Amino acid sequence: GEEIGGTVHKAPAAEAGYVASLHAAVDVLYEQGPALYLLLGGDGLASYVASRLVQTGAARPRILGIAGGTANVGPIIALTMDELESLTLDKISFVCCDALEARNGARFLALGFNDLVLGNTLLSTINGQALTIDALRLAREGVKAPAVPLGGISKDLRVIKNGMEVTGGLASPAQAVLSTLQQDDTYGRAVMGALCMAAGDRHTAALTLLDAPVVSFESRPEGKTAFMTASQLLFRSGDELSLRGLFPEVCLAADGNPFPLENGSLSVRLVEDAVMVYERR
């Protein structure tokens, strides 16, 4: 019963044809009232489809995602083709899955089911090779161009939670990542820092600010032969989180789908039980 988005997001010109066709196909399927949606693709396709279903008004649509993309990390993409072939209807069960709603000012951008990443790059595949590519060029021109992550996404990042600025985090992070913690077992895992404090709370998400990019195929010393620094902040259903002061070249990657930002800002909130996904046993 929760309103998502308000107005349907219009994709940048370069992707408008693809996204419009995808939305039209989803709308046709939705009108048929299927018991579940079978999806073959990657996390980006899954995010586009699930977001459209929720925006259209589908109440907790059941989505069975089959891996066919670059990363296939889920939670919607839950099975391989081989696993699907051995699956029987009596063994299919679903579980509710939270999402993160991303807005740029009053403009709805996307729902993220795995993560929302702020940077200038995203992960993709070119001629069968997994590469780090320029997010803005893909969004605006439809071009997959190899790129190197920025050294920083802001000179003085401001994080606001429920109208109050939260200080003490990295002011010039290389990347910012937001994700729900519903699918993760953080109980007793003190090594995870603040994330272990979310154990037992079903509808919790986290913001992590990093001094080196982790969403990248580039090999880096941070975390291996050099320290990586992270600032973590938890938020839950009902909270409103905003990030301000982002550089113009910073783009939102919602489950790998690029969305340019205006005025260097992003607002995020957690949406409880947005869809239902295949439950692994």
PLM segments and residue spans:
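ATP/nucleoside-binding phosphotransfer catalytic cores, i.e., glycine-rich phosphate-binding loops
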Residues: M192-R281
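Structural motif
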Residues: A35-L36, R62, D273
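Short, acidic/small-residue loops that bind anionic groups at enzyme active sites
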Residues: V49-T80
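ATP/NTP phosphate-donor binding region
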Residues: G1-L36, S47-S51, L84, L89
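ATP/pyrophosphate-binding catalytic subdomain of soluble kinases
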Residues: F94-P221
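Short, glycine-/small-residue-rich phosphate/pyrophosphate-handling segment
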Residues: T70-G112
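Generic beta-sheet signal
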Residues: L64-G68, L87, G119
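N-terminal glycine-rich "phosphate-gripper" loop used for MgATP/nucleotide binding
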Residues: L38-G44
